Amino acid sequence: KRSWHQTSRCGLAGGRDLYLVTLSDPETMGRLGHYMALRKIMLEDPEKALEMIDQFDTFKVPIFINGSIHGNEYNGADAAMRLIETLAFDNSPETLEILANTILLINVVHNPDGRVLGTRANANGFDLNRDFITQSQPETRTVAKLIAEWNPMVLLDLHGYYYPMLIEPCTPLHNPNYEYDLFIKWALDEALAMEAELLAQTGFKAQIPFLDDADGWDDYGPNYTPMYAMYHGAYGHTLETAYQDERGVDAHYWAVWGALKFASRNRVEMIRDQIEIFRRGFLDLPQMLIPDEILSQTDYDQYNELTLQEFPAAYIIPASTPGQVSPHQAARLVDFLIDNDVQVHSALQSFAFEGTVYPAGTYIVWMDQPKRGLANTILDAGRDLSALEGLTFYSPPAAWSNPLLWGAARVIMPDRIEVATVRIDRAVPPVGSLETGDSGYYAFLPNSLAAFQAANEILKGGNLYRASEKFEDSG
């Protein structure tokens, strides 16, 4: 016996739905709220969570399987359907073991519009697997919310087509905002388990970029589904099946099955290291280099010294002028951080930093928090890798910085100063104003998305002019 339920999320680019199927044994499904509460303890008190693992060994770990983010890579969704059928009806010891130890979250097809249209992109023409740090598309926002809610221990993203089948982890350069030593410790062994299951069941071979290649398949960019999930503590893998026919479905199915068995049997030790990721951030502990015993398994330089990050004490985000050109964009940035499970605080009183006085209500992102890596990825300007020679990237890193992209000012606080703050769950919505009295014209600066939207609304029914030179009015 086992239980499952299906939920749908609608409002996608082309009007179709996403379907999430959740499977486990009946006892687990009756206590879903309890298990989700346990996941929250990992973030609120990681040390208490570690103690709970010592006391109870009946906890379940969530595993997220993501089918066909690229619509024309059909095998991923087909393999997801086959996995659902097995997990729902099969009574073999392996299946029952997996259901007893895990909660399976299966997003059947991440890009239903692309699947119907036969396209890699969604109905808006976006490659959804380049969107996770911007989240411009509804499909991305939906899946990002699920990942942030569940903090899955493992995420498997099903793609095609590479020969032989490709199973991550990746080549360098590794993004320094991960806790890569903890990630690779389990991701590599899990990949080897997938490779072994694939070979045993199908005779197909696989490549593991971390072991088999010097470069060219890196996890530096945070835009991909597994890389985004890594900021939430997941052991994330992209799987690229080799064949477009039924053999490709077989390969995905058995590789995933190998991962499910591995995670089920090693969940206690794996969850400890997932919690350790959060504990390091929570206590502002230093990162660690990839251990020598792992480096010795590959012939290729992992640029280990570049896997470490110097985190600031905090980021200051002014809420209004003069420190912030656009309060709307500041609020947008703050809400984006909160939506992605990054903790944001508000100053309870004014404070001075580097000669500037910031008023009460200024936003502060303290970096001693469980998901500091994601916070820093969003807020940091990044590293200049121009001088790095002899290394090829899968997609040459573009500059990503949400503050720079959206025109929101933020200030780095290298060392902590004492500021009384309170955690918030939403930015204060900016309120505009309009001068009263007789006027021939109104003027405003187009310095936010809201301002451009207002300009477009005006153009629908009236005249709008753009100043060709600087001017002053009433001072």
What are these regions (language model features)?
Residues 1-74, 88-90, 95-100, 130, ...:
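Intrinsic-disorder/low-complexity accessory segments
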Residues 51, 107-108, 113, 139, ...:
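Structured alpha-helical segments in the cores of large, soluble enzyme domains
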Residues 75-77, 89, 95-137:
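Mobile, glycine- and charge-enriched loop segments
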Residues 79, 135-141, 219-222, 329, ...:
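Short, glycine/acidic-rich beta->alpha junctions
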Residues 81-83:
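Amphipathic alpha-helical scaffolding segments
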Residues 107, 114-121, 155-171, 236:
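Core alpha/beta catalytic barrel or barrel-like domain that forms the active/cofactor pocket
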Residues 127, 157, 240:
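Acidic active-site catalytic centers that drive phospho-/nucleotidyl reactions
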Residues 128-155:
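Catalytic-core regions of hydrolytic enzymes
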